[in-house]
Every structure is written in structure tokens, then in C-alpha cells.
């Protein structure tokens, strides 16, 4: 048992993924137990990144994890949607030991649109996990973010573990039985 936070960190760093990975026979998925992780949620201001980050943080705390957060939102009153100036983010470091900071570089980046990807990709750790809202990656949003071509096709993301999720489609499907206007559905 570690006596100080420094010893806890040393013990945690000493573990390799091979030591903490186990195979679940029931669903044939690999489960990886890690001592600490830093996650950053990024999207347009108004997309709910602060709310998502807060809910994620609250849920993690319920499970007894230590955590530190870093909300970030633009100083502009309302920058144009889909632009880098309008990107808001929420970073949380979660650990099974005492931590004092929200982490430096995220291990996981959840990018809700191309502008969020452009604003935060440079911070993602090598071989980090990148979760993209594939529904937002249309030609208009890609161009507005300042990309010359779709970053998913350019090779720029090759050094990351990329997961594309149709978040808008899934949200619409989950809320189809509620009497909500289209715009409210995407803000839910």
C-alpha cells in the first residue's frame, strides 16, 4: 500500500496495460483497468459540453473516483457556430488515487464537430482515443473549421484510435417518441 501520492503515481505508472487487461468471455470484449485517465469533451459553445462534463464528473464521483476538472469556454459573447473561436470544452481527470490537477494532455478527446477537432487535436496524447460525432463532419463544417480536406481521410488521424459515432442520429432516434421541436432534440 502506497503511503504518499507520489508512491501511488509510481505504482500506477509501473503497471503496464498488459498487466491490467482482461478478456471477457461473455461478450468477447477487452476490458482495460487503468489507474487514471484524462478526458476532454469539445464542441460548439451551446452544445452542452459543460453539462456533459459535469454529468460525467458527477457519475465518476459516485463510483468513488478522485477527480479534477477544467471547464473552458470562449470569451466571445457568441462566436459563429462551427468556428474555432466558438469551441467550448470540459476536461476531467479521473483516478483511483488522490489527484491535484485536471491533467495535461487528454487521453480521450470527444470532438462534436471539425472545429472542436481542429482546436484540440494537437493536445491529444499519441495513440489517444478520438471519438468523433460523424454527423457533424460535412463539407460545410470541415471548410468552416479551416481544413482543406476531411481530416478523417487526410491521414492526420492515423496515429490515434478513432471511433466515429453518429451522435445526432442516435439522439434523434432516442427522442423520437417525445414531442420536441427538431432543434430541441439536438440540444438534448
Language-model features and meaning:
Residues 2, 19-188:
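Active-site cofactor/cluster-binding pocket
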Residues 4-6, 16:
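Threonine-centered tandem repeat motifs in low-complexity domains
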Amino acid at each position: 500500500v502506497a503511503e504518499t501520492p507520489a508512491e501511488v503515481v509510481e505504482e500506477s505508472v509501473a503497471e503496464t496495460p498488459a498487466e491490467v487487461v482482461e478478456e471477457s468471455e461473455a461478450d468477447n470484449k477487452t476490458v482495460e483497468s487503468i489507474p487514471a485517465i484524462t478526458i476532454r469533451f469539445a464542441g460548439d459553445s451551446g452544445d452542452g459540453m459543460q453539462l456533459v462534463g459535469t454529468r460525467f464528473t458527477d457519475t465518476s464521483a459516485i463510483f468513488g473516483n478522485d477527480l479534477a476538472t477544467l471547464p473552458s469556454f470562449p470569451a466571445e459573447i457568441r462566436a459563429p457556430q462551427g468556428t474555432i473561436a466558438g469551441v467550448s470544452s470540459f476536461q476531467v481527470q479521473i483516478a483511483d488515487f488522490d489527484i491535484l490537477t485536471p491533467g495535461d494532455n487528454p487521453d480521450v478527446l470527444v470532438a462534436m464537430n471539425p472545429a472542436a477537432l481542429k482546436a484540440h487535436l494537437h493536445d491529444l496524447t499519441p495513440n489517444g482515443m478520438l471519438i468523433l460525432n460523424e454527423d457533424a463532419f460535412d463539407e460545410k463544417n470541415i471548410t468552416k473549421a479551416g481544413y482543406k480536406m476531411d481530416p478523417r481521410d487526410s491521414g492526420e488521424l492515423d496515429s490515434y484510435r478513432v471511433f466515429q459515432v453518429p451522435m445526432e442520429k442516435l439522439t434523434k432516434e432516442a427522442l423520437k417518441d417525445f414531442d420536441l421541436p427538431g432543434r430541441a432534440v439536438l440540444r438534448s
